[in-house]
């Protein structure tokens, strides 16, 4: 079991702790499939809602919060029945807008894993306005059930009434709908190919800047992030922050970054290169490879 979960395990019901410890191996990064959830329900004798609430300390252990020291864990449950954990991320000494919220982390985890719809979000503190707006961008976002400790389960519409969302801007394929943008680049570099593939899957209906970041560690492992825009603009999640959140979930240190690539579309009305470089240089002494590709 990874050391970062030791304190969390001590706070779990004994039967649940015993059942989940074998799942928290060196490769665990916050994903449990539907079958594992059923196994944990059987072993713990908890209802699914109580189980997911009980697992929040595990999710919160994924956080990196050098500024606030305030650990927030979130779990996104997909239509598939799988769950995806996430936690907040802060960059030491850097502006707060670089931060990733736990709900963003969990939802991006689900998105990168191929999930097409989020049905439930479980979180250990009430979602802030930023996160409510971020979740409202999802497929049927207003119907997403929000679960909080000692609170009645309510749909997002309860927490964000009279919401402004993608429908108000005539967007009919919201976040997590499969995106397939054709981007053209001739390269034999596996890392660049991976970045182009993720950029083609990014969600940027407002600026058309289909973009992605891939980070490579010194042992050759890659971690990706895609651009996820929001109708309210500011809650958009940048690909570098998504990639860093991805690394944090996998328990990798940012000092291990050996290479970083940003791909973005030539037809976008904005560029992410400045913000991406700021975040990268805050965590690693690596130069950003910035490639603009043609969109078909």
Curated annotation (Swiss-Prot):
GO MF annotations, alphabetized: cytidine deaminase activity; identical protein binding; zinc ion binding
Catalytic activity: cytidine + H2O + H(+) = uridine + NH4(+); 2'-deoxycytidine + H2O + H(+) = 2'-deoxyuridine + NH4(+)
One family name in Pfam for this protein: dCMP_cyt_deam_2
EC annotation from Swiss-Prot or TrEMBL: 3.5.4.5
UniProt key word Zinc: yes
UniProt-listed InterPro entries: APOBEC/CMP_deaminase_Zn-bd, CMP_dCMP_dom, Cyd/dCyd_deaminase_Zn-bd, Cyt/Deoxycyt_deaminase, Cytidine_deaminase-like, Cytidine_deaminase_bacteria
Gene Ontology biological process terms in this record: cytidine deamination
Residues reported to bind Zn(2+): 101, 128, 131
Cofactor binding, per record: Binds 1 zinc ion.
Keywords: Hydrolase, Metal-binding, Zinc
Domain CMP/dCMP-type deaminase residues, every copy: 47-167, 186-296
Recorded GO CC terms: cytosol
Gene3D superfamilies: Cytidine Deaminase, domain 2
Binding site for substrate: 88-90
Active site: 103
Cofactor requirements of the protein: Zn(2+)
Domain of life the protein comes from: Bacteria
Quaternary data: Homodimer.
Family indicated by similarity: Belongs to the cytidine and deoxycytidylate deaminase family.
Role description: This enzyme scavenges exogenous and endogenous cytidine and 2'-deoxycytidine for UMP synthesis.
HAMAP family: Cyt_deam
UniProt-recorded name of the protein: Cytidine deaminase
Organism of this sequence: Shewanella piezotolerans (strain WP3 / JCM 13877)
Gene from which the chain derives: cdd
């Amino acid at each position: 079991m990874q050391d970062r979960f030791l304190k969390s395990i001590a706070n779990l019901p004994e039967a649940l702790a015993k059942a989940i410890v074998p799942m928290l191996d060196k490769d665990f990064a916050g994903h449990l499939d539907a079958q594992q959830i059923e196994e944990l329900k059987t072993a713990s004798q908890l209802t699914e809602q109580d189980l997911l609430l009980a697992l929040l300390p595990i999710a919160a252990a994924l956080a990196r919060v050098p500024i606030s020291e305030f650990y927030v864990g979130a779990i996104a449950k997909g239509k598939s029945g799988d769950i995806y954990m996430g936690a907040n991320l802060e960059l030491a000494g850097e502006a707060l807008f670089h931060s990733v919220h736990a709900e963003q982390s969990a939802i991006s985890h689900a998105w990168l894993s191929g999930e097409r719809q989020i049905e439930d979000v479980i979180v250990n503190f009430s979602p802030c306005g930023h996160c409510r707006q971020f979740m409202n961008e999802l497929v049927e976002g207003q119907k997403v059930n929000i679960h909080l400790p000692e609170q009645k389960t309510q749909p997002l519409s309860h927490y964000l009434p009279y919401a402004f969302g993608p429908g108000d801007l005539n967007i009919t394929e919201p976040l997590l709908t499969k995106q397939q943008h054709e981007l053209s680049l001739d390269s034999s570099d596996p890392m660049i190919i991976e970045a182009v593939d993720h950029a083609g899957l990014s969600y940027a209906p407002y600026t058309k800047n289909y973009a992605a970041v891939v980070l490579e560690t010194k042992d050759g492992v890659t971690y990706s992030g895609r651009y996820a825009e929001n109708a309210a603009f500011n809650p958009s999640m940048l690909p570098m922050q998504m990639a860093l959140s991805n690394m944090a979930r996998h328990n990798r240190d940012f000092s291990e970054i050996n290479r970083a690539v940003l791909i973005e579309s030539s037809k976008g009305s904005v560029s992410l290169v400045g913000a991406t470089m700021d975040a990268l240089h805050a965590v690693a002494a690596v130069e950003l490879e910035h490639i603009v590709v043609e969109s078909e």
